[in-house]
Amino acid sequence: MVVDGKTTRLRASCNACNESKVRCSQRKPTCARCERNGVECIYGLSRRTHKDAPPISMPPSQRSHNHPRGASRSSSSGGDTKANSNSSSNWHMSPNVPFMIPPQQQQQQQKDEAAAAAAATPRFQCMYTPQDATADTVNRAGLLLDMDFSSLVTGSSSPLTSVDPLSAAVTRFPTPGAEHTNPWALGPFFGGNTNNNSINNPDWTRQPTTMGPMITVPTTAPPSPSPSCTECSCHAGVTELLSSMRGGGDDRRLSLDAQLAKLKRCIVSSETSMGCAHGRDDAEPIHILAVSTLIGYVIDEFEMLASESPLRLSSSLADMSGSRNAERVAESILSSGSDESMSMSSMAATTGVNNMSMSMSMGNLLEPRLSWGVLELEDDDEVDLRQRLYLLSFRKLERLLSQLTIYLRNLHDARAGLPEPSRHMAFVMACDYTRLWLEKKAEDVKRMFLVARPAGDETMDPALMFTAH
């Protein structure tokens, strides 16, 4: 539009739609919204083209102070003011200056702005109470900088905490803090503490409207596990032993007494884990898989003992017989011969005895001797007693496998009574097949112990004999 030879550009949207932050139909001279609401439609000057154009919410008393003092600027602004003198006699001011609008039009404007704010936020419904038209102008303008979000939830209409529709529409989505941007800090969704969520974050408590999908915000934390579940330590022994057996190679260099003590500890820890009663009745006892793995390690250790026990015993007997022969040779040399030959022979015999004693001490470090108080056991008796000791320890493993069988049978019966039992039978069948494999492997290892027993021992204890399952 050209006024007095100068091009004047107006805003794309009218002042009323621009104030309410809604889309304007841009129809001249009256847009659809202003025509529907029965208000005056005014298109102000464009701020991009006319830098000296006053803002929409600026009172007329402040416009004269913002005009530049110059001949060129004054002539241009004078032409612009003259061009809009007929249509801008009554500017549509923002809610921050209520005395510029008649009371009837101001009430209609507040209703329009509240409806526009609700239309701009279809998913959330802010509890807003329109404020009094006679409120203090300073307090109303200060709300834009210091707004209390609690009024959005409680719906209070006090002059100090009320919010105008424009501020409610612009600030309806708060900036999330670190507790909301971190996916692992979502307490209500991961069972965390939600006592402070409703106080520190009131914006999350707004009620959803029926226009969008329903969003259910949990108001209480999920039920926490009972203290007995959090304090359960029945499976700690199995976990610790499985972690220590990953190396495998270092355990083979242990002495026999240390190996048997560790195997006994594995058996006791497995029995404790199977006897745990802290789990839920409808949950799958995953710890049984860890117990089965530990039993497999125990069977491997017994297999190693069965394959290496004759070799160890024979080497131990050879060391003991060699040391005794060296002692006899030293005694015979010392009892006969001259002084020079005696000294030479004694040095050689002493060296041989020291070497045998060193090898004997190393053998004793790996293979401790069996004794019963002051009773000295013969070599053959010690071999026989060690073999029986292996079988006695292995009998504890067989008792553990029997307990595993009873446990899985009870688990099968319990899962059969639940709704949709086929959903749990796969886990029970997997555990049962693992048990069958462990029993078969244990039978083969026990057969190795019986084959490696000392020759000529026909009076074996019937309780230690192999019985097929």
Swiss-Prot record:
SUPFAM superfamilies: Zn2/Cys6 DNA-binding domain (SSF57701). It is found in: Nucleus. Residues 14-41 bind DNA. Keywords: DNA-binding, Metal-binding, Nucleus, Transcription, Transcription regulation, Virulence, Zinc. Residues 104-118 have a biased composition (Low complexity). Pfam families: Zn_clus. Residues 49-118 are annotated as: Disordered. One of its GO terms (molecular function) is DNA binding. GO terms for cellular component: nucleus. The keyword Transcription applies. Residues 82-93 have a biased composition (Polar residues). Transcription factor; part of the gene cluster that mediates the biosynthesis of the phomopsins, a group of hexapeptide mycotoxins which infects lupins and causes lupinosis disease in livestock. May play a role in the regulation of the production of phomopsins. This is Transcription factor phomD'. The gene is phomD'.
